[in-house]
Amino acid sequence: MTDTVHEQDSGATAGQAPSADEGLPSTGEESPSADEELSSAERNRRTRERRIAVHRTARRVLNRPGHLHTVRERLALLDDVQDLFDLDGPVDMYGNGVVEALEERTAGLLGLEAAVFFPTGTMAQQVALRCWAGRTGDPVVALHGLSHPEVHERNAFSRVSGLRPVRLTSEPRPPTAAEVRDFEEPFGTLMLELPLRDAGYVLPTWEELTEVVAAARERDAVVHFDGARLWETTTHFGRPLEEIAGLADSVYVSYYKSLGGFGGAALAGPRTLVEEARAWRHRYGGNLFQQFPTALSALAGLERALPRLPEQVAHARVVAAALREGFAAAGVPWVGVLPEVPHTHEFRVWLPYDAEVLGEASLRQGEETGVLLFSGPWDPAGPGISVAEVGVGVAGLEWTADDVRAAVAAFVAALEG
């Protein structure tokens, strides 16, 4: 499924079926014309504009992600930030000032020695793994086949940073300790994405995570966490952030995923690694002149959004159960909610209908009732099967289980209408 703030590789995304004619001999039919391709692009553009309009006018939604807001609404995130940082002090230049304050706050929350701000997570992780490769003498990075660098970053590890990713597994679950311990070739770094978004925001149990880390240590490998959404994991693991982050040698976190900031990321770990990463950040073009709007929005997210995430995770479990009950009561042949009990405040829903049909029903429900049950796109996941992501944000905390079941009934009515 397409996340509007992520770059996508060409080809099918995780969880989607390949094109129906992929790998088959030509039927002799002509390829779509440029006009048809343009028409398809125009259709997609109009659908997106319609989705944004419905989202903005809906009186009730489960989540209000930042990329669907107006500029004015996003600027409101900086209201009252004077309580978080002295706005009468000097503005930041090349990473000092408010950026340094954000780095210190992040390192403290994660219980790690230091942190360095990056404009993107893609850059942060390339720098982290490049630094570890230099220290271990091994450019091989063991990771999951559905991890973000493999699916969404256009092979940047190998093309830009000289790293060689190897896949422990591509199954829609976290890698196991046995897969790490018994992998057939050496690797210098193990990268774990927590949660694994393209497998459905899944997490291992705490015991499984510690066993996987121990298996990597047995191989003398460094452990790096792709923790873009690590902020969401404390409820599932039953551990504080600093204990979770403390399992790894380095951790990347995002300031817009989960926290709703304007953008940005941080790499946290030993002070010597962080200082080396600053040099590489400059070489990669990431040492921007001023970052105060983004840094202030990140501080606001840490102060306001982070404390509410456990409540959202708990309520996502209520919403997921009510969705299953609602679709069963409406007579839908089957529904998949994965994970069955969400590990974070985000999960996936699978239904036995074409994506275009489900997308149209979602929009029509929002337009006609003011209630938007599925605010994101539906994507094909096989013949006659589609999948959508559901996130329970602060707005979703207002929904009761009865509200969800009623919205499902209205959605199915729109589907059949």
Residues of each region from the PLM?
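Conserved N-terminal alpha-helix of the aminotransferase class I/II PLP-enzyme fold
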Residues: 46-120, 131-134, 144-151, 156-158, ...
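Active-site nucleophile and cofactor-binding loops and adjacent substrate-binding regions
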Residues: 115-122, 254-255, 290
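Conserved C-terminal alpha-helix-loop-beta "cap" of PLP-dependent enzymes
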Residues: 36-37, 41-46, 330-417
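Active-site phosphate-binding strand-loop segment of PLP-dependent enzymes
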Residues: 173-228, 232
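Active-site C-terminal subdomain of aminotransferase-like
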Residues: 43-49, 198, 203, 246-353, ...
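PLP-dependent aminotransferase-like
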Residues: 133-188
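N-terminal glycine-rich, Lys/His-bearing helix-loop that initiates the first secondary-structure elements
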Residues: 1-89, 93, 351, 355, ...
